[in-house]
Amino acid sequence: MAKADKATAVADIAEQFKASTATVVTEYRGLTVANLAELRRALGDSATYTVAKNTLVKRAASEAGIEGLDELFAGPTAIAFVKGEAVDAAKAIKKFAKDNKALVIKGGYMDGKALSVADVEKIADLESREVLLAKLAGAMKGNLSKAAGLFNAPASQVARLAAALQEKKAGEEAA
């Protein structure tokens, strides 16, 4: 690879690091081209799965200000640059790694911190943002309904008490 090509590749990878919300580093030893294509399809638009030389990736990470990943760049390494929700991409990679033992999750990077394999798996086990928002909305709606019932209860109790008093007075006047 010519020096100019290497510089261009480093700049491209550094730009991907900067543009991504998270990255997941994997080892792809033993995967076929068809397997990699299947993984890229599983990731969809949530991430870009890139294979690059480790030395170029190390330089690009340094250029992008990302630290703590150097030890992950050994052996055949590929990186998933996550554009959207990190949970969706981590779920897809974890599921693919479960089905294809040749794919090994090495770690990742998110919110300025290097992630261990356990961290990436924890992220994969989280609910997606949409599901969490739906659960929050449901909980809020339930609590609002309870609060409305509590606020309405004293008024209805007063109304029932007034009706009972009125009936009692009407009964006393009739007698």
Swiss-Prot record:
Pfam families, A to Z: Ribosomal_L10 (PF00466)
InterPro entries noted in UniProt: Ribosomal_uL10 (IPR001790), Ribosomal_uL10-like_sf (IPR043141), Ribosomal_uL10_bac (IPR022973), Ribosomal_uL10_bac_type (IPR047865), Ribosomal_uL10_CS_bac (IPR002363)
Domain of life: Bacteria
CC per GO annotation: large ribosomal subunit
UniProt keyword Transmembrane, yes or no: no
SUPFAM superfamilies per UniProt: Ribosomal protein L10-like
One example of a Gene Ontology biological process annotation: translation
Keyword Metal-binding: no
Keyword vocabulary terms for this entry: Ribonucleoprotein, Ribosomal protein, RNA-binding, rRNA-binding
GO MF annotation: an example: large ribosomal subunit rRNA binding
Similarity annotation: Belongs to the universal ribosomal protein uL10 family.
Record's subunit section: Part of the ribosomal stalk of the 50S ribosomal subunit. The N-terminus interacts with L11 and the large rRNA to form the base of the stalk. The C-terminus forms an elongated spine to which L12 dimers bind in a sequential fashion forming a multimeric L10(L12)X complex.
Function: Forms part of the ribosomal stalk, playing a central role in the interaction of the ribosome with GTP-bound translation factors.
Protein name per UniProt: Large ribosomal subunit protein uL10
UniProt source species: Mycolicibacterium smegmatis (strain ATCC 700084 / mc(2)155) (Mycobacterium smegmatis)
